[in-house]
Amino acid sequence: MAFLILLRHGKSVWNEKNLFTGWVDIPLSQKGIDEAILAGQVIKDLPIDCIFTSSLVRSLMTALLAMTHHSSKKVPYIIHDAPQQKQMSRIYSEEEQHMIPLYRSSALNERMYGELQGKNKQETAEQFGEEQVKLWRRSYKIAPPKGESLYDTGQRTIPYFQETIFPLLQNSKNVFISAHGNSLRSLIMDIEKLSEEEVLSLELPTGKPLVYLWTGHTFERRPEPFG
């Protein structure tokens, strides 16, 4: 058995400005920082063996801030993919026992919003019409101009989860994923076997952890309080 913790990053500066963010690398706002710390307090007693984030800073900030309150007192350290960086950041002491590896991947990035990125959501609705913007945002396979649909997002998140993260859970490793609303929705669709209609109604608030227990056969959603 193993725990899987999913956390949508805290509010970003652009979330608060009501702008489409997507792959634009925007940091957390002060409210987002507070949300990340509070989320860490909620999951502080759950075992965590490894952490995964997207390549975007708001995802990384959320994970690092959340872990400052973990009861294990272990420190996250980033595992670099580049061979030279990987070798140069190697730990040669017992201190490694007090650390938790953190892996970053663009496969977990937010849905890419294409030509909507940086635009105000309300102004976009006024420009293109509310129905068109609703289709771009809430349909399963319709993408905004030069952007991704939720389906497209799942085409990178789900294989990464199945090939890289799921084997860890099968080996009883407890995993914490800090990512984004749409990348996590696509993962939850796979984990909970949701239909296209069901996933479209799924809302994930910022800074609110979801916890699953992998039983060896299935994922079970755990109620709060966790631990």
Curated annotation (Swiss-Prot):
Residues bound to substrate: 8-15, 21-22, 58, 110-113, 121, 137-138, 181-182
Site (Transition state stabilizer) location in chain: H180
GO BP field: gluconeogenesis; glycolytic process
Superkingdom classification of source: Bacteria
Gene Ontology MF annotations: phosphoglycerate mutase activity
Classification via InterPro entries: His_Pase_superF_clade-1, His_PPase_superfam, Phosphogly_mut1
Active-site residues from the entry: H9, E110
Keyword Isomerase: yes
Pathway annotation: Carbohydrate degradation; glycolysis; pyruvate from D-glyceraldehyde 3-phosphate: step 3/5
Signal peptide: none
Catalysed reactions listed for this entry: (2R)-2-phosphoglycerate = (2R)-3-phosphoglycerate
A Pfam family that the UniProt record links to this protein: His_Phos_1
HAMAP family tied to this protein: PGAM_GpmA
Similarity comment: Belongs to the phosphoglycerate mutase family. BPG-dependent PGAM subfamily.
Protein name: 2,3-bisphosphoglycerate-dependent phosphoglycerate mutase
Protein's organism: Chlamydia felis (strain Fe/C-56) (Chlamydophila felis)
